[in-house]
Amino acid sequence: MKVINSSRKVQIPENVTVDVKGRSVKVTGPRGTLSKSFDHASVDINLVGKKELTVDLWFGNRKQIACIKTITSIIENMITGVTKGYEYKMRFVYAHFPINVAVTDGGRVVEIRNFFGEKIVRRIELLDGITCYRNEKAKDEIVLTGNSLELLSQSCATIQLRSAIKYKDVRKFLDGIYVSERNVLESN
C-alpha cells in the first residue's frame, strides 16, 4: 500500500545556517561546514523559513518512507557536528605484546607498532576533518575528534580493521584497537 504523502521536519538552531539546492544540503555552524548530497533518494527537501527544514516523499512504499527518517537523522547529526562536534575514544587491547601507537603529522596519521610482535609499521591516514591525539590521562588510549559523524566513524572502523588479527579465532586472540566510548563534545 502506498502512502500519499510522508513528511518529517528538522528544527534548525539559532547559530546554524542551512542551504538547500535540489537534494544537496549544506550546514554551516560555529565549528565549520558540512555538506551532503541525497541525490539517490527521490525526496523533496525544502526550507520553511530559517528555522525548519522538511523532507517530503510522495507515493512511497515502506522502504522509501524509511529513507526519510535516515535523511533527517543524517541532517540532525550534521547540525550537531557543526555546533558541538563528536569524539570517539579507542583503547588498545593486548595480551602479551604491548601495542605502541604514535600519532604523527599533526594528528592526521596513526602508526601502529609491535602489534602482536610484528616488526612492520601499520600506517593509517585519517579522513579529512578528523584529528587524533593520545590521551595523557588514560594509558593505552587515543581520542579522535571531528565534525562529521560519518567520517569519524569510518576512521575508527579503519583503525579497528587494520589492527585485527586475521586467520585466528577472535574469541581467543582479542588483540587490537577498539572503540570504547562515543561522546558529543560540549560547545566551548
Swiss-Prot record:
* Similarity comment: family membership: Belongs to the universal ribosomal protein uL6 family.
Species the sequence originates in: Dictyostelium discoideum (Social amoeba)
GO cellular component assignments: cytosolic large ribosomal subunit; extracellular matrix; phagocytic vesicle
Q: Which Gene3D superfamilies match?
A: Ribosomal protein L6, alpha-beta domain
Q: Which PANTHER family match?
A: 60S RIBOSOMAL PROTEIN L9, 60S/50S RIBOSOMAL PROTEIN L6/L9
| Listed name of the protein | Large ribosomal subunit protein uL6
Q: What is the lineage of its organism?
A: Eukaryota, Amoebozoa, Evosea, Eumycetozoa, Dictyostelia
Read off the PROSITE patterns from this record.
Answer: RIBOSOMAL_L6_2
Looking at the record's lineage, which domain of life comes first? Eukaryota
Molecular function terms in GO for this entry?
A: rRNA binding; structural constituent of ribosome
One of the GO BP terms on file: cytoplasmic translation
What does the UniProt keyword field contain?
A: Ribonucleoprotein, Ribosomal protein
What the entry lists under Pfam families is as follows: Ribosomal_L6
